[in-house]
């Protein structure tokens, strides 16, 4: 099942109709459930310029196996710029909440990879900023997820450990660091930040592991619920980590975190 986020398509900033994109959600339900269960809204990575398939549908199927509904959001990327992706995430959360009865959905987590994890954090932690210009039934629901799963996340866009390419693609190449740095997510942790599960590999050459450690440290400093796993070896973008005996355990660990630490119900 697929649902579009809006009844209309917002034109690409490039002015090229071929680059117009209507964001949508692919739905992967757990079949046969008799009561509402938790779900994960998956945000594939791609540096805010693409969306990686291996960080989408295969992740959804794995979380179905773990007893959770799953949803994959195909959000807008460059040439669309901030706040288009964040608006798409918040809209998706609201739409899914508005359909909770039909979907048998209880709590909802966002699960993002790399730049998709930056989107998960920014769209969740700043959800109230990204309302739709035209109100409808879905807009009456909260756009803030109940938990976050951040997989080898881009957290900073401008610090010495930042992934600068994501910031440039999100804001545009001529945007000053003072503007881009407003979405360095480690600086925005507060008492409303939801329970968060993070994992990374120590020698990730694409997005430095410090993105994860700094965010986790700020979560703990704020007294917030955060679980961090650093695996010793692995490249950036490993997705499910198949063929890696340690890394491939992360979905099980994340599923247990949702159930035991964030109060999610599973099938």
PLM features: residue spans?
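Mobile cap/lid helix-loop segments that gate and shape the active-site cleft of serine hydrolases
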Residues: 12, 153-188
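Short beta-strand/loop motif that positions the catalytic acidic residue
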Residues: 192, 198-200, 204
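N-terminal cap/lid segment of alpha/beta-hydrolase-fold proteins
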Residues: 1-33
């Amino acid at each position: 099942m697929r649902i579009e986020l809006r009844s209309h398509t917002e034109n690409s900033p490039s002015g090229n109709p071929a680059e117009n994109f209507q964001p949508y959600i692919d739905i992967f339900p757990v079949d046969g459930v008799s009561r509402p269960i938790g779900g994960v809204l998956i945000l594939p990575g791609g540096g805010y310029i693409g969306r990686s398939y291996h960080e989408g549908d295969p992740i959804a199927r794995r979380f179905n196996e773990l007893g959770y509904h799953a949803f994959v959001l195909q959000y807008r990327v460059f040439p669309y710029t901030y706040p288009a992706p964040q608006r798409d995430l918040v809209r998706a959360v609201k739409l899914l909440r508005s359909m909770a009865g039909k979907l048998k959905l209880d709590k909802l987590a966002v699960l993002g990879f790399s730049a998709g994890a930056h989107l998960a954090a920014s769209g969740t932690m700043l959800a109230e900023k990204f309302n739709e210009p035209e109100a409808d039934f879905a807009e009456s629901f909260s756009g803030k997820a109940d938990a976050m799963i951040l997989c080898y996340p881009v957290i900073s866009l401008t610090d010495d450990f930042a992934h600068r390419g994501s910031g440039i693609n999100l804001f545009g190449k001529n945007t000053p660091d003072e503007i881009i740095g407003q979405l360095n997510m480690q600086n925005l942790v507060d008492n409303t930040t939801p329970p968060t599960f993070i994992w990374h590999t120590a020698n990730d050459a694409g997005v430095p592991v410090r993105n994860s450690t700094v965010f986790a440290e700020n979560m703990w400093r704020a007294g917030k619920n955060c679980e961090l796993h650093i695996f010793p070896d692995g490249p950036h973008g490993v997705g499910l980590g198949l063929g890696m005996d340690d890394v491939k355990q992360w979905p099980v660990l994340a599923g247990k975190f949702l159930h035991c630490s964030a109060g999610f119900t599973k099938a």
